[in-house]
Amino acid sequence: MEKYADLLKGVDGDLMNPKRFMIVTLLYTLGPMSVRELRRALGVTWGDLDSNVRRLVEKGYVKLWKGLGSGPRVLEVKIGLTELGEAEYERLVAKLRELLNSLERRSA
C-alpha cells in the first residue's frame, strides 16, 4: 500500500480539498468567470467561497480582478487561474490518473 501513498507525495493538499478542487476544476475547464457565477455553479455560500478563494490566492493559484460585467452590474469581480494554478492542477490530475491506473491494473 505504500506504493499508492507515494504516488500522491508532493501534491499540494490544499488542492485536494474538495471545494478548492472544484473551484480550480471549473476555472481550468471553463476559464475565467465572475465570482458570482462561480458561487452559483458550486452552490456554496459567499463565506465558504471567500475562505476557499482566499486560500487559493495566498498559494498563488488564482487571481482576482475587476472587469466589465453583464446585466445591470457595470463592474464585477472576476476570478481566473494563474500559470502556477494551471500547472499545479495539471500535476494533481496527472498524479490522480496515475493512482487510478495503478489501482485498475492491480484489480485486473
Regions found by a protein language model. Name each.
Residues 2-6, 26, 83-108:
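Amphipathic alpha-helical dimerization/coiled-coil segments
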Residues 69-91:
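Basic, amphipathic "hinge/linker" alpha-helix immediately C-terminal to the N-terminal HTH DNA-binding motif
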Residues 31-32, 53, 61:
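Short alpha-helix boundary/capping elements
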Residues 60-67:
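A short, conserved structural fragment
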Residues 7-48, 69-70, 76:
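N-terminal helix-turn-helix DNA-binding core of bacterial DNA-binding proteins
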Residues 44-58:
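Short amphipathic alpha-helical interaction segments
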